[in-house]
Every structure is written in structure tokens, then in C-alpha cells.
Amino acid sequence: MTEYKLVVVGAGGVGKSALTIQLIQNHFVDEYDPTIEDSYRKQVVIDGETCLLDILDTAGQEEYSAMRDQYMRTGEGFLCVFAINNSKSFADINAYREQIKRVKDSDDVPMVLVGNKCDLPSRTVDTKQAQELARSYGIPFIETSAKTRQGVEDAFYTLVREIHQYRMKKLDSSEDNNQGCIRIPCKLM
């Protein structure tokens, strides 16, 4: 069984925990209880492959920002979550993305941009804006509602597919690097 380490990042109050709990336990948590750090595991089948999702739900509050580097180091892929009714949370996405790239020391890190709370009528972030941002980053964009479950599996499963593609790409490039090697058998005398 293949394990995937997913990290859910975003500003406080955007619904990171609600998304994660909706995926893991199939229910919506409507009271806001700020997270420091919670870890969840779930076995799922994605594209015919049994996968173990190791999901780290993180603190969005600024006072916990010092912990971010640590969990960003261990994560393989990131759900970058904003709330469609909170323009500031959308503006914050770039800072999360830049921090992930810095900590991972790479411009190529599996990520999915997630616009949560799409069930709410009071939208301040236009879908087109989010699509444009995701396109400029070269990552998928998915709108979700932790309340109605819309797009929840799609967001997490898309991230797993992004990580899988990333792993295959790294594997291919490491095999390409070995093409020029000459193997010389040695004999012990």
C-alpha cells in the first residue's frame, strides 16, 4: 500500500479542519475550534490503487507560523485552502506557496488550490480569479464545500494524483541520469 503525506494549509477559519474531517469521518463540523495541529490517516482506493493518506491539518493562525517550516518539510503535497467569502485568505495563498517552495527548496512541489465554502452565497473571490492564480502556478484548482461535501474527495484525490505524477517524474529523471553509467563487473580473488 502506498502512503501519501498530505498537508492542509491556509489562513485561520477557511475550513481546513472541516474539509479534513468531512473526508475522514463523513460529517460536517460547524463550530470553529482553532487547530494547532491534527493528524489523520485514512485508507482509500484512488484509480484502482489502495492508498494510505496521512493528512496533517495545520494551524492557520499567525502565532503558529513558526511550526510551519517543520510540517512543510515532511509533507509531499499541499492543499492550499482559502475561503471564497474571504479575500484576505485568497491573498494569503501566495505567502503559503512561497514558504512551501522555500522550505522544500524547489519550485516543483505538488499542490492543489482549494476554494472552500462554495455553498455560501456571499462570494468575494471570483472563480475566474482563482482559476487564473492556479493556472499561473501550474496547479489544479477545485472548489469545495465541507458542509455539502462538494469537491472534498476530488480535492484530496487530485493532490494524491499530483504527488503520484511527481514521484513518477522523479523516478524517470533518476533513471535517465543512470543511462550514461557503465557497469563493470568485479571479481573477488
From Swiss-Prot:
Alternates between an inactive form bound to GDP and an active form bound to GTP. Activated by a guanine nucleotide-exchange factor (GEF) and inactivated by a GTPase-activating protein (GAP). It is an enzyme of class 3 (hydrolase). GO terms for molecular function: G protein activity; GDP binding; GTP binding; GTPase activity. GTP binds at residues 10-17, 57-61, 116-119. PROSITE patterns: RAS. SUPFAM superfamilies: P-loop containing nucleoside triphosphate hydrolases. Residues 187-189 form a propeptide. One of its GO terms (cellular component) is Golgi membrane. It catalyses: GTP + H2O = GDP + phosphate + H(+). One of its GO terms (biological process) is Ras protein signal transduction. A lipid is attached at C186 (S-farnesyl cysteine). A motif (Effector region) lies at residues 32-40. Belongs to the small GTPase superfamily. Ras family. Ras proteins bind GDP/GTP and possess intrinsic GTPase activity. This is GTPase NRas. It comes from Xenopus laevis.
